[in-house]
Amino acid sequence: MRVVSEEALSRHLAALRPTMPRVVAGGNGATPWTVLRLVDDALPAYRLFVLNAAPGLPERDGVVLETPFIGAGMRGRPGLEYLPCRLSLVPAMLRTSTPPDVVLVTTSPPRNGTVSLGTEVNVLPAAIEAVHSRGGLVIAEVNRAMPYTFGDAVIDMGDPEGAPDIETQLLFED
C-alpha cells in the first residue's frame, strides 16, 4: 500500500473498468466515508456491497446497493438488491457470484508495517482476498480512532515510512 492524495485516487478510480464495478465497503460503524465519497464522485455507475450499512450511503441513479444483511442505511431504498445468504457463506459469495473490483476499508494507523481493520473484520478479509485474486483495488482510509486489533484484522502494508499522523489518510493498493 502507498499513501495517495484524494486527487490521485479520484483519477485512478475514474479510469476503472468494468463500466459497472462492484465496490465492497466496510459497514457497521466502520464505513470509510471519505473514500466512499471519492468513489461516488469518480464513478458514474457502480454496485455497492455493504453489510449492515449505516444511513448516508449514496442515493442516486447509477448506484445499485447490494447486501445479504440489510442495515438502517439500506432499508426501504429503491433498487436495493437483497442477496439471501448466511453470514458464514458471504466469503464464498465474494469468491464466486459477487466478486469485488474494489474494496474500501477503514483501518488503524500503521504499526510496524501493518494496519488493522479494527472493529470491522467480519467479511472484509475474504473481500480483500477475492479482490486480490482478480487484480482489483484495496483502498484504505486510515482513522486514528480505529483500534488496532489482531488476527485476521491485520493487513501488511509494506513500508510505513512517510505515513504522516493525520486524522484521515488514504492508502491505495493495486
Label the model's feature ranges.
Residues M1-D174:
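Conserved alpha/beta enzyme-core scaffold
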